[in-house]
Amino acid sequence: MKKMKSKIYLPIEVKRRELYSRIYFSIKASIQGYSVTIGRKSRFHEFEKKIQPGNYISKSAGTQNFDHIKRLKKAGHKIFFIDEEGLMSFNKEFTHRRFSEEGLQLMDVIFTWGNNHKNELIELYPSLKEKLKIVGNPRVDILKDISKQFYAEEIKKIKNYYGDFFLLVTKFGKINFVKRKNIIDYYTSHLTKGYLNTEKLKEICKRSIKHEEKNFVNFINFIKLFNASLENKKL
C-alpha cells in the first residue's frame, strides 16, 4: 500500500464557484499520495481541534480570521493562502483591500494566479516576496482542453435539452444582488467590514459601482438588440 505523503485541507467558501475545481485538485493530489479533505470553511472552523496537522489552504486573510489561523499554526498545520478574487485587477489597492500585510504574514506560502498578481502583491507588501508562489488556480485547470471530459456528461445533457445557444456570462454583483440582513448595498457592506479604510478606496468603490450600473444598462440593451437582430438564435 502506498504511504500517504501528508494531509491537505481544502475549505470551500462558495460551492458553485469552487467545488468542481477542488474535486479535480483532490483527485490529482490523491494520485500523488496526499490525503485530501474538502468541506465548508465554517465546518473547518468548527472542527479545527479535531483535524490532524497537515497543509491547510486558507481562503481568508482578514482580521476576523487571524485567531483561527494562529490556532492552526500552533497545532502544527502549515498554512497556505489562495485568493479566489485575485485574477482580475484594475487597481491593486482596491483589488487587495480585503486583507492586510499582518494577515498575509501569518501564511507560510501565498499562492498567486500569475505574474501580474504576484507583482502587485510585491509592490504592496515587499516583505512577502519570498512567500509568493505562482501556481494558477484549479478553477482554470478544469477549463483546459485536457480536462473538458470532467464536464462531458453535464455538457451532453445541457446540449440535448437546449440545443445550440450562446452563453453570455455576466457579473453584476455590486448592483444586482439579493439583499440579506448583513448586506444592504455593496458600498455599505465594504465600509462596515473595514475594507474601505482610505478616501481613495472609498472613491474607487463608488466609481466601480457607477461603472457597473452603466454596463448593466448596456447589457439589457444588448439583449434587446440580439433578439431583434438574431431572432432564430438562442441566448
Q: For each of these PLM feature ranges, what is it?
A:
Residues 1-10, 215-222:
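Generic start-of-chain signal for non-secretory N-termini
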Residues 3-156, 168-177:
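Active-site and donor-binding regions of nucleotide-sugar-utilizing enzymes
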Residues 148-235:
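Conserved catalytic-core segment of nucleotide-activated headgroup transferases in glycan assembly
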